[in-house]
Regions:
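Conserved helix-adjacent loop modules within structured domains
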Residues: 36, 42-49
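Catalytic cores of nuclease domains that cleave nucleic-acid phosphodiester backbones
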Residues: 1-40
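Metal-dependent nuclease catalytic regions and adjoining charged, substrate-binding loops involved
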Residues: 47-52, 57-151
Length: 151
């Protein structure tokens, strides 16, 4: 899906699998992931690789696509990650995003004392970098003149 907008910024996404159920009037987005630790996907991939951002954007892409295709009355189901084991030992698992995880992906969240930025903050940071043509330092560190407080 190319050319959909989130907070004034244009995106494109290439989803692995999309199922349109015309009888139930639903659209389901799937993303395929292969990892060495299927049961630790949440901490070792979803958080570490920021897959929550991908899930959020795929959902927005599916909403835009459905509207363009004349399926605006279809329910866009929350994304699912189909996770397989790279060693082919463990069975695959399906991880389903929830409304809470979508809200976290949008707004950012904390997990085990670590902050994870949301799409809203990231797009704001990107807009700031575009507007100011500053790419070699984060907005936060720029605004504090490069002074970072410890502890």
């Amino acid at each position: 899906m190319e050319g959909y907008e989130v907070f004034g910024h244009m995106f494109k996404s290439m989803m692995d699998k999309v199922i349109v159920d015309h009888k139930a009037k639903t659209v389901q987005v799937y993303d395929l992931k292969c990892t060495w630790s299927v049961e630790n996907f949440y901490s070792e991939y979803y958080l570490y690789r920021r897959a929550y951002i991908q899930g959020f954007l795929y959902h927005k892409a599916a909403e835009s696509w459905a509207s363009e295709m004349g399926y605006g009355d279809y329910e866009i189901l929350l994304p699912k990650f189909i996770v397989c084991d790279s060693t082919n030992y463990s069975n695959p698992l399906v991880y389903s995003m929830t409304q809470d995880s979508m809200n976290n992906a949008l707004d950012g969240f904390e997990y085990k004392g670590r902050e994870y930025p949301g799409v809203a903050q990231l797009i704001g940071d990107l807009k700031w970098a575009l507007d100011n043509d500053v790419w070699n330092i984060s907005r936060e560190n720029y605004l504090t003149n490069g002074v970072v407080k410890l502890g």
